[in-house]
Amino acid sequence: MKSKFIVPVLKPESYLRKILSTPQGILYIGKYPIKDLEAHILVGDIVSNTLRGNIKIIDYKTRRHINIKPIINEPLTNLVNPRGTMSLMSRTIAKAKNYRTIIVKGEEDLVTLAYALENEETSIAYGQPDIGVVIIKSNRLKALRILKTFKPDIVVYNKV
């Protein structure tokens, strides 16, 4: 039997999800793996395996269904983050600054906002499926502007 988790989250409005699904930074077009790029925060398994970065946010999946095992050589932790949300636990883990690899049960995309809040200036790299890699420059103020539009919610999560 699967365990159920009650997860406090922040959810973006639907209009914002559409905006955030388009590339928000510089798009490097090319076949995977694109190498010779680096960013402070890497989001996604393929990007985390091929680029250089300080923090890796992964979920052992590509396009939500293909399981892959990235190379992990640093301290890691697990995080429950339901799809389309930023769990409050992601903020706690980002603030702790003890982990270089975060394995997400759910969806990793919005977890990056928690890390952007912790840095005056940061760079984030993520994959744009079938196109390439996006690198965006972010900072605490940009993250706060986005997060202030999110609404608090509770999600019952039973996919762990």
From Swiss-Prot:
Q: What is its EC number?
A: 2.7.1.237
Q: Which residues form a coiled coil?
A: none
Output one GO BP term: coenzyme A biosynthetic process
Q: Which reaction does it catalyse?
A: 3'-dephospho-CoA + GTP = GDP + CoA + H(+)
Pfam families in UniProt:
DUF359
Residues annotated to bind GTP: D45, I46, V47, D59, K61, E108, D130
What this chain does, per the entry, is described as: Catalyzes the GTP-dependent phosphorylation of the 3'-hydroxyl group of dephosphocoenzyme A to form coenzyme A (CoA).
> Would you tell me the protein name for this molecule?
GTP-dependent dephospho-CoA kinase
Species this chain originates from: Staphylothermus marinus (strain ATCC 43588 / DSM 3639 / JCM 9404 / F1)
Q: What is the lineage of its organism?
A: Archaea, Thermoproteota, Thermoprotei, Desulfurococcales, Desulfurococcaceae
